[in-house]
């Protein structure tokens, strides 16, 4: 017998004699899976083991990546969760919270996956993802003009259901992307092209059902007004899991009117600089039924401007308003398209009228995935023509970045900044979204696009809000600050930018409802004990 064979035999005999108590401990994912399976109460009609995906599950990566909306995080390098719980029952949420706390795992809550910097499905330490896509019911009461919508429902599903149930005479003020999940979109504010008429989504939310850090199911009455205040604009993921929202539906006319006018540079009779300057004068002051978004981009060293609008009424009334307030744009009858409000959802996606059925907004998986970076700003004073020319020059040198100017005013200026946790109200003319998209992998391309975004962002600093330089929570931007140790000092860096003076109230509420800071992530609200 050779020496190697003898050694192998000895090792084998030794291993066979080891007591079972010395066997390898179960993996963390096994312990978590067992913990949630043993949790009581449970729903025998929806056993949680049918909704748990660990890294050994054959479709783990499919479930994880189905709601990754930024290809920057769609790779083998990002840390993967210990498990994904695709909750289909409230007991699944309670079990996930209880077991994550017990095992010291961080929790990431994902409804639509549109967190621009991936904070709903990424972490630097062991974590689990609570995926809400199975919880998507929408119960509409047409008599009361209200609806209960679960967090996993998309805006497209909500819009489609509301329009069908109301004979196209009701809508809801929220985002223009139908794939957004209600959970995160609403809790960060929820803005869209009816905000000048009706405010944000949170201004039309009248109740919520949540699961708190103790696993309790609460509504507005039992959670208290302070927590309900925080959920509306403060980012619910810092406080609880939102199971469902009760929304107030709003009237929409039988027909709305949309248009999109594009200009290129300053050539001939077209002067983009003058048009943008005039847009600044009127966009936040014009009729509340009219929303005109201005998007600026550049190609071939020429700035392009897009004036995309929606009027809650017919084209004749729209033209009267435009001829009186913005004749320089030159909007004419044939450029105005009348359609149902539900059809306008597709128009804002860039889909030509009549080329796709409204059911297409029910598609949950986008046809095209992209790499992206987003940032935000608020403008409170008009940018001078000299300033605009300077900005245009920088844009021609950084052509991978666009800016969308979204006008405020109207209802947005009437609601006090302390009415909800969302503080950006009166005094803001418009909000800017910086957007860089790219379509090929590689570090060099990503670095170039990120650098271009940062250069434009820095160049805009003289023209935007200051002390703090305000930011919009739903345009998640890790560059403005993050908390690695969950301290107040770290949290206030980004907290005052997102929430201004409302940040201090959010910290107090957080400290009361989640003193152990279970619900935390890189930009969560800190607790006072960390002060």
Swiss-Prot record:
Cofactor: FAD
GO annotations of cellular component type: extracellular region; plant-type cell wall
EC number: 1.1.1.-
FAD-binding PCMH-type domain ranges (all copies): 77-252
Subcellular location: Secreted, Cell wall
Signal sequence range: 1-23
Disulphide-bonded residues: 35-99
Modification after translation: The FAD cofactor is bound via a bicovalent 6-S-cysteinyl, 8alpha-N1-histidyl FAD linkage.
GO MF, one example: FAD binding
Tissue expression per record: Accumulates in cell walls of etiolated hypocotyls.
Note accompanying the cofactor annotation: Binds 1 FAD per subunit in a bicovalent manner.
PANTHER family documented for this protein: OS08G0158400 PROTEIN
Membership in a protein family: Belongs to the oxygen-dependent FAD-linked oxidoreductase family.
Protein name, as recorded: Berberine bridge enzyme-like 9
Organism: Arabidopsis thaliana
